Amino acid sequence: MRALYPGSFDPVTFGHLDLIQRASQLFDEVIVAVLRNPNKQPSFSLEERLEQLSSVTSHLPQVRVTSFEGLTVHFALEQDARVILRGLRALSDFEFELQLAHTNASLSGQVDTLFMATAVPHSFLSSSVVKEVARFGGDVQHLVPETVAIDLRRLFNQRVDVGGDR
């Protein structure tokens, strides 16, 4: 069975990566799809986010990274994905995600939503939090893969040393 994990991934975090790795053990294929949202100004370009995701998932043969625009449920149907994966960090995530799941079900009864609880070490983690920490010079190496930490330091014009040391 094929699953779709959509998101902005701006940037990809260890929370995202944990969910991708666990999903890859449950499904034959996991499509990690970066949403091209014309109404948002991401910190990283679509190409940068695709490269970040491809790099950190290259060791997972059943993971495919791509992008899409439009309704997630329509893209899931185009990709023959029967499941949309969503990570839940807290109860507050559940209410919003449940509304989306019900909306998707009303648009297509052929695609289910599967909620996966975020692993405890990543339960506080969001891309917004990571960018805020990085913006003010905080260490994000425990929050994102090393290549993404380097990208964040470059984004915020901070010194980048070889080997990830600051």
From Swiss-Prot:
Annotated positions binding ATP: S8, F9, H16, G87, L88, R89, E97, H122, S123, F124, L125, S126, S127, S128
Pathway as given in its UniProt record: Cofactor biosynthesis; coenzyme A biosynthesis; CoA from (R)-pantothenate: step 4/5
Cytoplasm recorded as keyword: yes
Gene3D superfamilies linked: HUPs
Main location per the UniProt record: cytoplasm
Keyword Nucleotidyltransferase recorded: yes
Enzyme Commission number: 2.7.7.3
Site annotation Transition state stabilizer: residues: H16
One record GO biological process: coenzyme A biosynthetic process
Keywords linked to the UniProt accession: ATP-binding, Coenzyme A biosynthesis, Cytoplasm, Magnesium, Nucleotide-binding, Nucleotidyltransferase, Transferase
Primary enzyme class: transferase
Gene Ontology cellular component annotations, sorted alphabetically: cytoplasm
InterPro entries referenced in this protein's UniProt entry, alphabetically: Cyt_trans-like, PPAT, Rossmann-like_a/b/a_fold
Catalytic activity annotation: (R)-4'-phosphopantetheine + ATP + H(+) = 3'-dephospho-CoA + diphosphate
Family matches, as CDD domains: PPAT
Pfam family name, one: CTP_transf_like
Record-level Gene Ontology MF annotations: ATP binding; pantetheine-phosphate adenylyltransferase activity
Binding site for substrate: S8, K40, T72, R86
Subcellular location: Cytoplasm
Cofactor dependence: Mg(2+)
Role of this protein: Reversibly transfers an adenylyl group from ATP to 4'-phosphopantetheine, yielding dephospho-CoA (dPCoA) and pyrophosphate.
Family (UniProt): Belongs to the bacterial CoaD family.
HAMAP family, A to Z: PPAT_bact
Subunit structure: Homohexamer.
Name of the protein in question: Phosphopantetheine adenylyltransferase
Native source species: Synechococcus sp. (strain RCC307)
